[in-house]
Amino acid sequence: LTNALVGQKVAIMSARPQTTRHTIRGIVHRPDAQLVLVDTPGLHRPRTLLGERLNELVKGTLTEVDVVGFCLPSDQKVGPGDRFIAEQLADAARDGRGTPVVAIATKADLVGKARLAEHLLAISQLGDWADIVPVSAETGYQVDVLEKILISHLPEGPALYPEGELTDEPVAVMVAELVREAALEGVRDELPHSLAVVVDEMVPRTGEDGATPMLDVRVQLFVERDSQKAIIIGKGGSRLRDVGTTARKEIEALLGTRIFLDLHVKVAKDWQRDPKQLGKMGF
């Protein structure tokens, strides 16, 4: 949804919940407004130190924004996780500035009108929302409506970013996220949460013709167990090659230059619970 609002890919996409690891800013420029979207990890009941730190990140973000968008997929029933988030948002509203919350029924294109109506009713009963809006990032349905609603809750003030800037994400972070997105494609349930990606270096050089600019990108993929390492690498390295091919195309499109992508998979046992490992990985 962030990508649909910005009009360009600034955040990775995965069908797995709880795979966002840091806040991602996407910037929407309009003649009369500038919308800075802060895409955060989802609030959840943490089971690891990483989960606790991500929750702290989200709660800190909630104190800094002017309006909150709470996404509830239309193809899933409102469940305990949604109720937990609704309670956390209500607590934040009581303790803070009373920041308005817009409930967003995402993936509206995946359900019929009757199912969507049921979902919107369930959302309305979940909390006291400033607005409720169904959207589809895939088809663009009501993305413009959501944009106008979010802008309506913004205070007047100067633009925070220059025209044309779509994100303030460091390039290395975006590269790492694109590799992680490719690695998450089609993996089993437990692996997404155990995978971390770190860019070691990005070194410019010229290609073999001596003229074409290139970039050598060295990336490490960390997992928690040897069995997970085997999944990422695949038989004879086939899966890791596929990950590299997919990620390389995305990274070249992002950077506008050819790259040589060097991927290495390492085991960092229980890194999600290890403060030192978390620090090394930027958490």
PLM features per residue range, with description:
Residues 8, 27-31, 61-68, 92, ...:
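Conserved, well-folded catalytic cores of nucleic-acid-processing
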Residues 18-21, 51, 55-58, 62, ...:
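Amphipathic alpha-helical transducer elements in NTP-driven molecular machines
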Residues 1-15:
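A conserved segment at the C-terminal end of the G1
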Residues 26-38, 52-132, 186, 203-214:
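Conserved C-terminal guanine-recognition region of P-loop GTPase G domains, centered on the G4
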Residues 99-102, 109-171:
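Canonical P-loop GTPase G-domain recognition
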